[in-house]
Structures are given as C-alpha cells and as structure tokens.
Amino acid sequence: MPKNSHHHRSSSVNSTKSRSTESTNKWKIPHYYRRSASGSTQASPDRNSSTGSCSTPVLPTMNVMSSPKKVLLEDPRDNHTKAKKSSRKKSGEMVFVNYTVQDTANENDTDLQTQPVSVPAPKAKLKKKSSKRRMLKIFGSSKNEHIEDIVEEQPMVLQMDSESKPLSGTPISESGIDASSLTTKRSYNSFLKHNRLNGKTPFSGNLSFPSLNMMGNTTDLPIDNNDFCSEKEVVPKSTHDPSLAKPPSRFTESETNSTPNLSSIPLMNTKNTRLKYNKVAPQSSDRQKSQESGLYHSTESFNFKDQNYSNNKSSLSLNSDLSTPHFAKHSPDSPRTSRSFNCGDSQSKVKLPEENDASIAFSKMFTRKRANTGGSTCSLASPTIAQTIQQSNIKVNKLPTQRTTSVGSLSSMSNRYSPIRVASPGRARSATRGSSLYRLSRDLNSLPSVTDLPEMDSTTPVNEIFLDGQPQHKSGSVKGGHRKKQESISDAQRIQHSNSYITTPSSSLVTPPYYMTGYTLPSSASASSTPNVLETHNMNFVPSTSTVTSYRPSSNFSSFDKEYSNENDASGEFSAFNTPMENIPALKGIPRSTLEENEEEDVLVQDIPNTAHFQRRDIMGMDTHRKDDSLDFNSLMPHGSTTSSSIVDSVMTNSISTTTSNATGNYFQDQDKYTLVNTGLGLSDANLDHFIRSQWKHASRSESNNNTGNRVSYSGSTPNNVDTTKTNLQVYTEFDFENPESFFHEQSKLLGEMGHSNNNSNSAINMNEPKSADTYIGNISPDTSATVSLGDLMGSNVSNNSERNFYDGHTFVPQYQANSSVENSNNQNAAPIANNDIDNNLQSFYFDNSN
C-alpha cells in the first residue's frame, strides 16, 4: 500500500492528534499531487490492517485512475459498514475528481454524528468528527458540506479536524505542536471559508474579528466546543484582553523588528485577509496588536502554507509556543487565536477555489503570460495591448512627412489593420511568412501611397483605412478571406483615374497598387498579393496610361532630407524581399519610371544633391519637364560609381554587369515607359557592348520587321520627324570621360558593324545641335546584335580634345528608356540622341528610331 501510505501522510498526522480506530478517507489535491510521508500509519489498527490488506492486493491489479475509488470503498467496508457507507458515498462523490484518498483515524462516537453532516470527512476520526461537528455547528450546519469540500480541495483539511480537537481539549504543548500544525491545514479551509460565510455566527465573528472579540465571546465558543473549559478561560480572557493586548503589541513590535515583514505581511498575506484585518483594525488598536501577535504567528504559518504545508506545521507549532508565553494564562486560547486568524487567511484563500495545491503549482510553473499571437479578445482587452494599439494608431496618424516610409515601416499599421497580427507589436517582423508583415497590404491599394506621405495629412482619414479591403478587380486567386469594409483609398484613386484600365492579375501577378498602369508585374517575392520590390516602386510612381508622364520632385535625391522616398526599405531590411533572380525571366518589362527611380535611388545612396529632374519624354517625344542646360551632370550621377541600385541589379541582371536576356522579351508590348539599366559598378571601362547588344537584340524581337532609320537630335531640339505613333526610346548615356578610347574601344567595331548591317534603313541626322560637337549616327536597329558604341558616336565626328575637355572622371552607364505611345500600333521607336551642353559636362543621347 505504498500509494495509500503517501495518501495517508496527513492521516498519520491526524492520528497523532486523535487516536481513533476509525479512519477517514479524505481527498487530497489531484491524484498526481502526492505528499511524501514516512509510511504514515493509520492510527486505527483496524483501519490500517483492513486498508493494508485491501489496498495491497487491489493496487497492483488496479489502474491508477480507478485504484483510489476501489481502495477507498473497500477500506471503509472492512472497518465498519456504517462508516464505510458514508465514506463510500463521500468517496464516490470525490472519486469523479480522480483524487487520491487519505486515511485518518478518528476517535469518538461523535464521528458517527458528524459523518452525515460533513460530506467529505464523514469517516473522520470520532473526536475529529466531533470537533469538526462542533466547528460546523459554530459555522452553521448548512455549510458543513461546503467546509468539507474546501477542505478536500486543500489537503490541509485533515489537520483542520485535528486542529479543532486540540482547540477543544488538547494540552497547550500538544496543541502547540500537533494540533496547531494540523490546525494549519484543516483550519485554513473550513474555518476561514465558514467564517466568511457565517460572519454573523458568534464563533465565526470571533475568528474573523480581533482576538478581543473572540475572547469576549468565548462563552459562545465553549458551548459549541465542549472539550474546551471555555467558561474558565472566558473570564480571564475578557478581563485580560486589554492587558494582553499591550504585551502582544510590544511583542508584536519586537517581533516585527526582528522579523519586520512578517507581522505586516500576514495582514497583507491574502487579498481577503488584508481587507478583513484592515477593517478590523479601527475597532481596537490594542486588540489588533494583540491579535497581530497571534496573526503574526498564524499568518507566518499561513504564508508557509502557501509555500509548503510541511513548513506550516513547524511554523504553526512555533507560533503557538511563542504566542503562549505572551498570553500566559491563556495559552490554550493563543493557539486558538492564531488558528482563527489562520483560518481567516485560509478562508480568504479558500474563497478562491482554484487556489489549491494544483493551481498554485500550475501558476508557479507558468508564471509568464503567454504572448498574444492570436490577438484574442481578452488579450486585446488588456490595457497594455490597448495602449500598443493606440500607439500604433498614433503612428499611423502621425507618420512624419520627413521620415522615409517604406514597406517595412508599414508594420506600425499592420498591428492595427492586419487580420493576422491584430495586436502583437513585438512581432511586427514575424518571419512566419515572407509576406505576413505585408498582410496589411493584402492589397496596398487600400493604403495611402506609402511613399506619398503628403496624402497622409490630416485630410486623409487614416483611421478609416482598412488594409484588408480587397479591390473589386482582384482575382479570386487572392485569398477571399478579407472583406472590404469600406471604400479603400485605391478605389478612390481608381474613381479619379477612371480612364485607366486595369488588367486582372493572375495568381502569380499583382496589379501594381495605387496607380493602375494597365499592366501587371509578377510578384517575384511571393506568390501572394504582397507587392515585391518592383511593385512597390511602381505602386507610387508608375503613371496610368492616361497620365503620360510621372513628375517626380527633386527632393527625392537626399535620402535624409527627402520628404518621401520610393526606396523600398524592405529590400534592404528583409532579404526575403530582395527580388529573386530566378524570377526575373517572368518580367515582361520594367516600367521606365521604376528603373529611373532606381537610378535616382542609387544617387540617393550616394548622397548626391537633389538639383535636377530626369528628363521625361512623353509619347510625342517632347520634354514634359524643362531641363536646365546649366545643370551639372555631377548633381545627377554618383561620383565614380554607377546609377543602378541593388534592386535594379537583382531585377535586371543575373550577374552584376549582365542584363538578363529575356527581361525585355516583350519589350514594347505593355505600352508604357520602360528602362533598362546596365550596372557598370563604377568601372572606368564599362562594357556597354553586352548591355546594348542584348537589349537591342531582345527589344527588336517584338518588331523584327521594323528596320528603322535613325535620327539624332539634341534635347533642346525636337526630332525632325515627330511621329506620335512611334515610341521614343530614351537613352541616357554615361561613359568614362577620362578614358574615352578604352571605354569605347570594344564598341567601335560593333557600331560600324551595326551601321553596315542595316543597309535597308534610312538614317537621318538632326543637326539641331550645338556647334561645339559633331554627332555621328549609325544605323541602330533593334533587330541587330550590334552595340551602340559611344566611342564611334563621339570619336568619329567629335574631336577627342573636345571630349577630354569635359571628361570629369565619372563613369556612366547608359539607361535605355522606351516611351511607348498609346497609339503605338506599329511598335516603332523614335530614339533621339540628345547632347545637352557638353560644356556643362552633361551628355544625353536620344536615339530616334523611325522607318
């Protein structure tokens, strides 16, 4: 019966108190919780023998779950049929909880009386039952079951019985040691709970209120507790109350000094007790002090009770001993006082049914609050999370205009709007899913333009924005779990740009948000609707087809001073959002505005002063933005570096300087401005051969039948033959001014080859150019594999001396930008070569390709 021995530990303690033949089956904390006890032997030999015999054969055969029930039932049967019956009923009631059972010996016939009254401990030792019965009477018979239940919940109940017994009749020393220790367990549950419930009853009032009241009312108590010589005790108590109060107060002070926190802590020990004693305090400071001394001991034990019941016994016995000399003649009452207060503490504790050993252990194991990953209602209701949400809202409302906003900065909004990340601000950048951070941008259309923070002004009802609003045009491929709660900003934009047509993206494509340009880009970062690097750029600066050009403020050049930036911080911050190069082949073309802005972004990285606009050419081939002739090219281009950004590198090149061959497979089909960028990486000798050759070669696939004549014009002049139906291929050419020959050496032959390869093409030269330089034009045809050689362009007709005059040691990489007209049915290209003022160190070649 090792199992029973564990269970019977408290029973052994009880047996020490009351030595009765009958054993009581008491429920301890959940069965898994066992107190280690030296083979606790049941005080009743009959019980022990019967239980031993019954439990020993039964336990090995029985399952752990069922064993406590069977053992309990059999044991009471073996001892006494009556007691067995009552214990069976109660044990059966308990068993459903699957708790373990303790066997304790009770003494007197009173147990028989008490058994029907107290459900859990009907088997309690006769004297225990009698004492318990008395206690129950004091508390009120109606609440006996309650008491027992609570006691059952907490293993201290058994000691409660023993406690009541020593209170009734055990000597001071005995009560001080065994009775008090037992009292700690037992008294906590039954006494306190019932005191609270029946505060009006005289004894409960005594327990709950200061010791003085208890002393004065001891007459009531002796009636209930026959064992106590209450009458004798009552008079001295009442008389000595004030005197007793003083020494205890001194004692309390000394005790408090020695252990300054204990006396105060008991009062603070539990919420209920704290309130209770605070209320009592005004009645009599002396009383409370005397009480405090008792409380000090009792509470101390009670504190230990929370920590460990075994400690409670020793501490409680010490308490009773300590309190005894202070109460001198009334030593039997001092343990009672401490017990009563202990009961008060336990009562408050018992008030919370979950406060049992199991709950305490569980709370100790799980002290931390779980992180709110799911955004449950409770978590949202918590003040901290509410504050976090408010802060996030404030962030959303107060997005600083001077701050560079990026997709990464949307995390502040994601906390509020993201259906997944409802309110877990600590996990703004959760890596659970590549695009989980951007779930808020299920469709960034619903957000105001991330980079156009001017729209985030007070005029924009930011709080009204719902990130999960799905634009109606989105295909069903995007998860339909998000419902549009209101008209999103993107819808308003579409209404404004009603003339812009929108293509429904496939599952792998995402319509560039906010500005619907009529074409879709593959979301290379993820298959979800999260915009990738290109899309985020396109989102704000790709004009709709109705808008011919996109004007970009010059303030974008400074990465710190810029009012807003189209730079996608996510690409830099999150490697997951760097455009995978394996997805590049899916790109049909890159919007001109995107790469042009990327070029500018490199300039931003270089901290180039923002003094100029890139020249944008509309479908007519005319400059939509005035370009300063006095503009210094240094203001536009990074010194000794390239204009391409890492984003462009990843998008356009598989290797650093090699442009993906199929990136422009349908170069002219989307009918918008495109840009191809070759990254020279600041090489003094940039190989334009591969770049120009491959790009012209692939660009020509869509119009292999069009061998166009080439015209050259300077930006200040309009091409001789302005054909609105022809797309303008805009080229910004940059090269090493210090080493022009080396820079153009490889291309010199290729240009000639290209010029000779197109014999059927007409070449026209627009001589509206400064007299300071000659312009050479070769036949540049998209279908040829030849490379435009600036060396030939510059070297053939422009003197090297004049070139060297404006070589400033900067390496430039050409940027090809196709301006496709809406009416470009023939896919014809006009690429004027424009040389701005060479004296101003700025060269731009515009190649007009026309039939």
From Swiss-Prot:
Record's compositionally biased regions (Basic and acidic residues): 71-81
Biased composition annotated in UniProt, kind: Basic residues: 1-10
One GO BP annotation of this record: G1/S transition of mitotic cell cycle
Highest taxon in the source lineage: Eukaryota
Entry keyword set: Phosphoprotein
Record's compositionally biased regions (Polar residues): 37-66, 254-271, 334-349, 489-504, 702-722
Entry keyword annotation includes Phosphoprotein: yes
Modified residues (Phosphoserine): 334, 757, 761
GO cellular component: cytoplasm; nucleus
Biased composition (Low complexity): 11-23
Region (Disordered) residue spans: 1-91, 233-271, 315-355, 466-504, 698-722
Function of the molecule: Dosage dependent suppressor of PKC1 deletion and MPK1 deletion. Involved in cell lysis.
Protein name from the UniProt record: Protein BCK2
Protein source organism: Saccharomyces cerevisiae (strain ATCC 204508 / S288c)
